[in-house]
Amino acid sequence: MGKVIGIDLGTTNSVVAVMEGDDPEVIENAEGSRTTPSVVAYKDDGERLVGAPAKRQAITNPENTVSSIKRFMGRFYDEVEDEIEEVPYEVVRGENDTARVQIGDRKYTPQEISAVVLQKLKQTAEDYLGQEVTDAVITVPAYFNDAQRKATQEAGEIAGLNVQRIINEPTAASLAYGLDDESDQVVAVYDLGGGTFDVSILELGDGVFEVNATYGDTHLGGDNFDKRLIDHIADEFEQDTGIDLRDDPMALQRLKEAAEEAKIELSSAKTTTINLPFITATDEGPQHLNMDLNRATFENLIEDLVEKTVPQMEKALDDAGHSKSDVDEVILVGGSTRVPLVQETVEDFFGKQANKSVNPDEVVSLGAAVQGGVLSGDVDDVLLLDVTPLNLGIETLGGVMTTLIEANTTIPTKESEVFSTAADNQTSVEVHVLQGDREMAKDNRTLGRFHLDGIPPAPRGTPQIEVTFDINADGILNVSAEDKDTGKEQSIRVEANSGLSDEEIEKMKEEAEQHAEEDERRKERADTINEANSMAYSVEQGLEEYGDKIPEDKRSTLQEALDALNEELETASADEDITALEDALEELNAAWSAAGEEIREAQQQQAQQGAAAGAGAGAAGAGAAAGAEGPAGGPTGGPASGNGAADSDEEDVQDADYEVVDEGDDE
């Protein structure tokens, strides 16, 4: 196995890291940033943007720019009604009642969108390592259910990655934090990202990272903070002007970006100003938004959201069997933990200062890289014992959920229980697999259903049906049912309710590869266009400076080649075939090379003539001084002509330097 990269696939930003020697390292992307916005945009001309370039154009293209897609991963349409209201793009009902994104006439699954981000991270790692990357560890929120985990695996597969392991974000953070610490300690990891919240209690010691308990909320994160700010600003503006900016997608996108910036600024400053000129227009003319916002107002807006995390911390401690005083370290993970109110709430709860030695944006990817190192054999003496976040069981008589594997059970694990029939002469049983913490089956999430047929007729309660739940290290479930009398067995690998068959995943994978190839071709074409522009400029400058040194026939050929290239440049596009431009560039290069030889010959002749004239002047004049001053009898500045020739030799070499203008490389 080669290098196994670690990926934090985040709601707002994503990060990729890899083990370098004994330490995990975050890899910078092509834009020079250590984090990549989890944003994908589709332009009218078919071009696809990802990361910072996609985020930059969101204001002018909000309906076709997808962000926060992680909130829709592995989710039914009816589960994400609140999230749908918060995004500018269209979310529709797809197959199997899943949520999908409508872009033009195409419905994209969240897995496909996430795969585009993963492709970007994969390419980032390959550029850094100088080799193909196929294996990865990807992190998910600890409270992700089975469907969300499977959807994340599918996204990796579509992106061309072999997902070696899915691990929980708080657990990954603890790996990065505690890799070099051999002391026994209890650690609380508080992870508040862009769209999800988790808190985990772990015991660390002697290379063993054991998760005792985890709780969370997959509907809570920095996006919710932004939404409160957006509504506050929009309400204030509507009160002043009577205009609701939330009805205008472009204005709403500007508002969203301003709210995000204000949130970040208020993490370090007491006040900030939101200034959005020309935010909208009325019959009276353009309207501008200018508003001062202080930290106290912001904290009042989000206080109840932050308080929602407190009961989760209490539950995690209780399930772990620890008290607050047992906790040795509190680690903050996720960009939203930079908000002072969040830090104060966590520190007040645990009664100690949080450990801020790790970068909250990067620590999860670093931990994923460590786990990748464990799997590849680059890291020794590390054992990760994670837990399943929710109860797992089946529906039994009366619509009750009977739990086989309880929440916060260490994985991998396997549990069996014997059930029987509910009616006389029942020859088939349905196994309805559930995940959740509610008592009744209807209140929990269905993971799958299957039937065990061929049970011999018998009075109810007589057949012995053994149901086995088996969870692997990724937290993904296999369920089997066996009739103990006949030995007949039926099993199911619980699949995500993504509506994706193996064939569909393979098709999406091929499309993703084609997109990657097209993106590379587009970049190559853009580079060629830039080179052609630079070449045309250099030749124009050369003709202006040295045109009199080029014979008429070659000067005419050069001018024709230059005109032909400029004509091609007028219509050249990185999105289309540019074979004609490449041919014109090659012809201009050849013509310029031939002209260059004529220029060099002319300059050499001039240099020789200058040197000869200078020598004649020295013989005819009255000494060296006379030669220098150039009196009657010798041309002025003979030696200077010689120096001029030397200068001309240097100037003859025209450096065709050009700046690569690639929107994808601009931060």
Swiss-Prot record:
UniProt entry keywords in alphabetical sequence: ATP-binding, Chaperone, Nucleotide-binding, Phosphoprotein, Stress response
GO MF entries: ATP binding; ATP-dependent protein folding chaperone; unfolded protein binding
Pfam families with a match to the protein in the record: HSP70
Signal peptide start-end: none
InterPro entries for the chain: ATPase_NBD, Chaperone_DnaK, Heat_shock_70_CS, HSP70_C_sf, HSP70_peptide-bd_sf, Hsp_70_fam
Gene3D superfamilies xrefs: 1.20.1270.10, 3.30.420.40, Actin, Chain A, domain 4, Substrate Binding Domain Of DNAk, Chain A, domain 1
Entry's family note: Belongs to the heat shock protein 70 family.
Name of this chain's protein: Chaperone protein DnaK
Species this chain originates from: Salinibacter ruber (strain DSM 13855 / M31)
Lineage: Bacteria, Pseudomonadati, Rhodothermota, Rhodothermia, Rhodothermales
Gene: dnaK
